[in-house]
């Protein structure tokens, strides 16, 4: 490592038969070749299916990275339900499922539901048994064409909005208290509904 700041000059003091612990990677070019051959073998074996599955477009956590969009692990159960795909069928047609991820905004839900719908519009499912197609299987694929792409529905970054002058309304808007109030409103939704129901029952009892 190059010396770039002030400090003690590195001097490795070797002890304990250090030659035994030296690790070499002379097989790196061979491994690279075998990995490539394995990818080609897999692609030929599963053809005409795509090698990589479709992935959801997600935003990374933390304020540092959350303006970017990247590929996630799998689609949420809520996204699959909105797109009309069952959890069990999804994994059989190249749609990965991640039961842990949650949709925290309507935008993320709609974005990934749209991705699933576009994917399903281009998807051709061959029947397991020839001549016995099930619901959703393709019956006539004579006019179908195979499309070669680098990735299944590649993820593109969202357009960055130009900076705008801060308005008086934006200055007066209190984001923290607004979010806090909304969370409190959602938290007591059940209690509020129960109270209103009780009030309505009491009003009905008085009428009688």
Swiss-Prot record:
The keyword Cytoplasm applies. One of its GO terms (molecular function) is structural constituent of ribosome. Transmembrane segments: none annotated. Keywords: Cytoplasm, Phosphoprotein, Ribonucleoprotein, Ribosomal protein. Coiled coil: none annotated. PROSITE patterns: RIBOSOMAL_L13E. The modification Phosphoserine is found at residues 177, 180. The keyword Phosphoprotein applies. It is found in: Cytoplasm. It comes from the Eukaryota. Gene3D superfamilies: 1.20.5.110. Disulfide bonds: none annotated. GO terms for biological process: cytoplasmic translation. InterPro entries: Ribosomal_eL13, Ribosomal_eL13_CS. Its main location: cytoplasm. GO terms for cellular component: cytosol; cytosolic large ribosomal subunit; preribosome. Belongs to the eukaryotic ribosomal protein eL13 family. Component of the ribosome, a large ribonucleoprotein complex responsible for the synthesis of proteins in the cell. The small ribosomal subunit (SSU) binds messenger RNAs (mRNAs) and translates the encoded message by selecting cognate aminoacyl-transfer RNA (tRNA) molecules. The large subunit (LSU) contains the ribosomal catalytic site termed the peptidyl transferase center (PTC), which catalyzes the formation of peptide bonds, thereby polymerizing the amino acids delivered by tRNAs into a polypeptide chain. Component of the large ribosomal subunit (LSU). Mature yeast ribosomes consist of a small (40S) and a large (60S) subunit. The 40S small subunit contains 1 molecule of ribosomal RNA (18S rRNA) and at least 33 different proteins. The large 60S subunit contains 3 rRNA molecules (25S, 5.8S and 5S rRNA) and at least 46 different proteins. This is Large ribosomal subunit protein eL13. It comes from Schizosaccharomyces pombe (strain 972 / ATCC 24843). The gene is rpl13.
């Amino acid at each position: 490592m190059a010396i770039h700041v002030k400090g003690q000059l590195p001097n490795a003091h070797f002890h304990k038969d250090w030659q035994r612990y030296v690790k070499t990677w002379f097989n790196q070019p061979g491994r690279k070749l075998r990995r490539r051959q394995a990818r080609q073998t897999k692609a030929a074996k599963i053809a005409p299916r795509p090698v990589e599955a479709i992935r959801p477009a997600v935003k990374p956590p933390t304020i540092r990275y959350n303006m970017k969009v990247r590929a996630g692990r799998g689609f949420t159960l809520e996204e699959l339900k909105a797109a009309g795909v069952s959890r069990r069928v999804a994994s059989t047609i190249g749609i990965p499922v991640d039961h842990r991820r949650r949709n925290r905004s309507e935008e993320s839900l709609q974005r990934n539901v749209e991705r699933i719908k576009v994917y399903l519009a281009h998807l051709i499912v061959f029947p397991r048994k020839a001549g016995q197609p099930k619901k959703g299987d393709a019956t006539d694929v004579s006019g179908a064409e195979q499309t070669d792409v680098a990735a299944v529905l590649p993820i593109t970054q969202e357009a960055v909005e130009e900076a705008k002058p801060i308005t008086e309304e934006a200055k007066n808007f209190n984001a923290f208290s607004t979010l806090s109030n909304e969370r409190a409103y959602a938290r007591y939704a059940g209690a509020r509904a129960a109270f209103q129901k009780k009030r309505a029952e009491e009003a009905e009892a008085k009428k009688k």
